[in-house]
Curated annotation (Swiss-Prot):
GO terms for molecular function: electron transfer activity; flavin adenine dinucleotide binding; succinate dehydrogenase (quinone) activity; succinate dehydrogenase activity. This is Succinate dehydrogenase flavoprotein subunit. Part of an enzyme complex containing four subunits: a flavoprotein, an iron-sulfur, cytochrome b-556, and a hydrophobic anchor protein. GO terms for biological process: anaerobic respiration; electron transport chain; tricarboxylic acid cycle. Substrate binds at residues 242, 254, 354, 399. InterPro entries: FAD-dep_OxRdtase_2_FAD-bd (IPR003953), FAD/NAD-bd_sf (IPR036188), FRD_SDH_FAD_BS (IPR003952), Fum_R/Succ_DH_flav-like_C_sf (IPR037099), Fum_Rdtase/Succ_DH_flav-like_C (IPR015939), SdhA/FrdA/AprA (IPR030664), Succ_DH/fumarate_Rdtase_cat_sf (IPR027477), Succ_DH_flav_su_fwd (IPR011281). GO terms for cellular component: plasma membrane; respiratory chain complex II (succinate dehydrogenase). Its main location: membrane. Keywords: Cell inner membrane, Cell membrane, Electron transport, FAD, Flavoprotein, Membrane, Oxidoreductase, Transport, Tricarboxylic acid cycle. It is found in: Cell inner membrane. Belongs to the FAD-dependent oxidoreductase 2 family. FRD/SDH subfamily. It is an enzyme of class 1 (oxidoreductase).
Length: 588
């Protein structure tokens, strides 16, 4: 079957913050760029980012990018790569002021400068008093960011393919990535997008869990595509559980609520975070706050309600005026999903899967990496990854709030700047043969031919329940081993699942089945990685190994898809402009 071909200098898969920032940089340089998105670009999941962009602008107090770097390294539980963290914190202010000049409508201080609010894990002067470092557009910062970047991409003539679903990467005989195949959801047409550079910006995969702040589109498509192309993934055991998802709904309640002065209560009305983090209290690292809430619930101090035990987030003491100006979106979400009015009563919250710290290992320039037999990093020609799908790794074992939007903008821009130079300089990659392109259609053909078998909805439900029960906030060896065995069975069931809808136009069931393949591979890589790391670090907290073990585990974990085995990869402790921050005990 010969596919129609569309040819571009670069194809960017995913139109969230990172994908649109990379595409913008490529288009501005005069290269041709295709931007593929399975939803309309401003519906990408970046739209749900609420609190802000953490960056050392120094608008509310004296600030310094090195203080921001210290907090990020500490937050990562010391497995964030310090060269990448340094680059992000140092170039952050420049990248954010560029957004301001593009027209991003930030909230303002009285003197007209960008408003910055306190967020968890932030400090002045290397661990001193609480800092206010998160630049915000009320509590709709992601929404403002997406609209700004979308307008700029239109202005710079990026070719946008809206509601196109990327199927798989296409590799040539040399192992270089030379584009991808994609399905037009509207017509059912399949096209080969041929490109000299392919940028994965597909976002997270929170839908492997039952309870998540992530939209239904966050199905790990980039992880699945990478693994099927033989690309390893790093630190997949590291999943952030946001302390405050609305109980029963999973909808995110921004950390900005606590930054503005909100606090958590147990059923006795006690501010319990004072016991777990005496200094930072409710603004400790997210992993610390999430574990504290779960301990309160396990020990019987959770609040009761129709959605099961939970904590309460109190905001009413801030007053109606502050809430309406600083947190208007939270008022709306709480009234809709929790049926409470935060102006009068607290919001019921529970830790909820939020962010994938792991992903495709990359350089600061977004170039995807694999590891050779000697354990050395090797660049994969033609493949880039930016945003949540990438593991640069600036977040290590625990991301700080507000650093995700900074990651999107800084590394989307960095990949674009690199491609600006390299596309012009590099020779032409060898074309993929017809059989290379056809290889990327195997999954689509399998689903199209499977008319009998199990209902994929039941399989997805089993997958999500397995992950929620065995790989959540607290983990334990026996449960995780059992969970991995269950996933092996679910994986076999998936091979014989059926597709009922045979239509070509707007066949959403077909897309959901293809997404399920990606959820499966992401969940499996997570389970293998979580069983491998025998310590507690950041978001990976094990009852059977409660301590951090720097002697054996101050490293990244790498899942190799060909052998389904694990290896270690060293953490970069060599920033270029200042001495490294050595590992120490992490307290808040």
């Amino acid at each position: 079957m010969k596919l129609p071909v569309r040819e571009f200098d670069a194809v960017v898969i995913g139109a969230g913050g990172a994908g649109m920032r990379a595409a913008l940089q490529i288009s501005q340089s005069g290269q041709t760029c295709a931007l593929l998105s399975k939803v309309f670009p401003t519906r990408s999941h970046t739209v749900s980012a609420q609190g802000g962009i953490t960056v050392a602008l120094g608008n509310t107090h004296e600030d310094n990018w090195e203080w921001h770097m210290y907090d990020t390294v500490k937050g990562s539980d010391y497995i964030g790569d310090q060269d990448a963290i340094e680059y992000m914190c140092k170039t952050g202010p420049e990248a954010i002021l560029e957004l301001e000049h593009m027209g991003l409508p930030f909230s303002r201080l009285d003197d007209g400068r960008i408003y910055q609010r306190p967020f968890g894990g932030q400090s002045k002067n290397f661990g001193g008093e609480q800092a206010a470092r998160t630049a915000a557009a009320a509590d709709r910062t992601g929404h403002a960011l997406l609209h700004t970047l979308y307008q700029q991409n239109l202005k710079n003539h990026t070719t946008i393919f809206s509601e196109w679903y990327a199927l798989d990467l296409v590799k040539n005989q040399d192992g270089a990535v030379v584009g991808c195949t994609a399905l037009c959801i509207e017509t059912g047409e399949v096209v080969y997008f041929k490109a000299r550079a392919t940028v994965l910006a597909t976002g997270g995969a929170g839908r492997i869990y039952q309870s998540t702040t992530n939209a239904h589109i966050n199905t790990g498509d980039g992880v699945g595509m990478a693994l099927r192309a033989g690309v390893p993934v790093q630190d997949m055991e590291m999943w952030q559980f946001h302390p405050t998802g609305i109980a029963g709904a999973g909808v995110l309640v921004t950390e900005g609520c606590r930054g503005e002065g909100g606090y958590l209560l147990n059923k006795h009305g006690e501010r319990f975070m004072e016991r777990y983090a005496p200094n930072a209290k409710d603004l400790a690292g997210r992993d610390v706050v999430a574990r504290s809430i779960m301990i309160e619930i396990r020990e019987g101090r959770g609040c009761d309600g129709p959605w099961g035990p939970h904590a309460k987030l109190k905001l009413d003491h801030l007053g109606k005026e502050v809430l309406e100006s600083r947190l208007p979106g939270i008022l709306e979400l709480s009234r809709t999903f929790a049926h409470v009015d935060p102006v009068k009563e607290p919001i019921p919250v529970i830790p909820t899967c939020h962010y994938m710290m792991g992903g495709i290992p990359t350089k600061v320039t977004g170039q995807a990496l694999t590891v050779n037999e000697q354990g050395e990093d090797v660049v994969i020609p033609g493949l880039f990854a930016v945003g949540e799908i990438a593991c640069v790794s600036v977040h290590g074992a625990n991301r700080l709030g507000g650093n995700s939007l900074l990651d999107l903008v800084v590394f989307g821009r960095a990949a674009g700047l690199h491609l600006q130079e390299s596309i012009a300089e590099q020779g032409v990659l060898r074309d993929a043969s017809e059989s290379d392109v056809e290889g990327s259609l195997e999954r689509l053909n399998r689903w199209n031919n499977n008319r009998n078998g199990e209902d994929p909805v039941a399989i997805r439900k089993a997958l999500q329940e397995c992950m929620q029960h065995n790989f959540s906030v607290f983990r334990e060896g026996d449960a995780m081993a059992k969970g991995l065995e269950q996933l092996k069975v679910i994986r076999e069931r998936l091979k014989n699942a059926r597709l009922d809808d045979t239509s070509s136009e707007f066949n959403t069931q077909r897309v959901e089945c293809l997404e399920l393949d990606n959820l499966m591979e992401t969940a499996y890589a997570t389970a293998v990685s979580a069983n491998f790391r025998t310590e507690s670090r950041g978001a990976h907290s094990r009852f059977d190994f409660p301590e951090r073990d720097d002697a054996n585990w101050l490293c990244h974990t790498l899942y190799q898809p060909q052998t389904e085995s694990m290896t270690r990869r060293s953490v970069n402790m060599e920033p270029k402009l200042r001495p490294a921050f050595p590992p120490k005990i992490r307290t808040y």
